[in-house]
Amino acid sequence: QAGFGSSARFYDASAGLLGMTPGSYRAGGQGETIRFAIAQCSLGAILVAATPRGICAILIGDEPEPLLRDLEARFPQAELVGAQADFERTVAQVIGFVEAPRLGLDLPLDVRGTAFQRRVWEALRAVPAGATVSYRELAERLGMPGAARAVAGACAANPVAVAIPCHRVVRLDGTLSGYRWGIERKRTLLEREAGKS
């Protein structure tokens, strides 16, 4: 249950923080216009997408095409609009954050997920740059000490790489564990945040 009497109560409490409503989540973005752009950064190809309310996807990979297919799968009912010059500033801010994460990213988010996922994502946003937390520690912070696997699943479902810093979650012994954007990218991000690169 994630500590709320219902999903609606969680969404009411967090709508200003993470954005997308349950209806929009279930409808695959129906009625949404999502602007996106694909660029290159030091971690590879990066796709940044946003609704009028905020960033809804930051996807990182080796090639642009799989990133676009991922976005289309996430929002099959949305109108996707690419290559708009006025969106370049947003993309530049995200890339700047990837390159220098200690500077922070001051952009609104509009992400979709279950009440539990969104609760995990909010907890992740409270982990400062340069720090790490284990899946178990994060579950304990949520008041759910036995939910480490569920926390890992929520991290894997994170649609906004770096803005919701699931790369800051490590194994209990401090070693790196899986990262949907690639373990080497996770290592690079953590080193940057620690000031090692």
Per-segment meaning from a language model:
Residues 2-3, 8-146, 192-197:
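Basic nucleic-acid-binding alpha-helical/helix-turn surface characteristic of O6-alkylguanine DNA
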